[in-house]
Structures are given as structure tokens and as C-alpha cells.
Amino acid sequence: MAKESGIGMSIAVDDSGGSARTISNDITDFSLSTPRGVQDITGLDKSAHETLQLLADFSITLNGVFDDASNVAHAVFSTVPSISVARTVTITISGQSLPNETFFNDYALTRAATGELTWSAPGVLAGGTVPTWA
């Protein structure tokens, strides 16, 4: 496998009805994290840390440009404040995909002084399934 850029990647997010919507065109940037919890179990007899690996997690923040056409970003996220459903987020790049059941907890719009209208949507792992690239 070669080193690659993120150009040409795809992100799909379920709308509140469970239909996957590819909204890559509306997303300008994103960040995701797949951390693992750790517990320090160092005994008094140790001179270095001893740890246990704990639960897996997933979080994502999608950022984009406002688009209120049908079945794109605004249609997907405008229901976040009123409908509490887990949404499948699928990130795909170079044949690799990372699907996760995600709760989005905000859909924030920002109108900058220069005029642009952008949005941000942070989400967290919902289903208890370990995030796994396939």
C-alpha cells in the first residue's frame, strides 16, 4: 500500500430516516479519533507504569459549507436537535472503510463577518461496537 492523500475520499451519513447520504461535497474538513481507555494498575512494587487497555471509542467532527439542497448536509443534520437517532457514518478512502454508529450532539451554524455560512457537527460512538477499518 502506498502513501496517499485524502483527495477523493467519501463520507456518508445516515439521515434521520436511516438512508445513507453521501455528503462529501459539503464537507470541507473533518477530524476523527479512535482512542482506547487505559487504567493505571501500577503496584507499589513497580518502578514503571503498568496498565490495562480498556474500552474503545470513536468521535468525529465534520465541518462544511451550508447546502440546503435535498438529501445533502443540511437535510441530514437539521434533525439533530429534534430527533435522537444513531446514524451510520461511513468514511471511505482507497477501498478502506470505517463505518460507525454515531450520535451527533450538535449542528452548529456560523455566519462569519466575511459572509460565509458554515456548519460543524460533532458526533460520538453510539452502538458499543469497536471501530474497525475494513
Predicted feature descriptions by range:
Residues 71-105:
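Short, acidic/charged, Gly/Pro-enriched secondary-structure junctions
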Residues 65-70, 126-130:
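Acidic glycine-/aspartate-rich tracts in secreted/extracellular proteins
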